[in-house]
UniProtKB/Swiss-Prot annotation:
UniProt cross-references to InterPro entries, sorted A to Z: CopZ, Cu-bd, Heavy-metal-associated_CS, HMA_Cu_ion-bd, HMA_dom, HMA_dom_sf
Gene3D superfamilies reported in the protein's UniProt record: 3.30.70.100
Pfam family, one: HMA
UniProt-recorded Gene Ontology molecular function terms: copper ion binding
Entry protein name: Copper chaperone CopZ
Record-listed Cu cation binding positions: 13, 16
Keywords carried by this UniProt record: Chaperone, Copper, Cytoplasm, Metal-binding
UniProt-annotated location(s): Cytoplasm
PROSITE patterns, per database record: HMA_1 (PS01047), HMA_2 (PS50846)
Function: Chaperone that serves for the intracellular sequestration and transport of Cu(+). Delivers Cu(+) to the copper-exporting P-type ATPase A (CopA).
Chain ranges of the HMA domain: 2-68
Single biological process term from Gene Ontology: copper ion transport
Amino acid sequence: MINKVINVEGMSCDHCRNAVESALAKLNGVTSAEVDLDKNQVRVDYDENRVSVEQMKEAIEDQGYDVK
């Protein structure tokens, strides 16, 4: 299991938090995702054999946010 912090631009409210956390939770291999709005970050626990960082970034970007 890997823990990764991803920097995300454009999140500002609970709707943003829910959108990003839900998108990541749908990915096979993600065990948890927690958004920190103050830091513009999401902390993700995942199985690197089942999901890639690139797939997680795409899921976030598909919700309309920019991954830095």
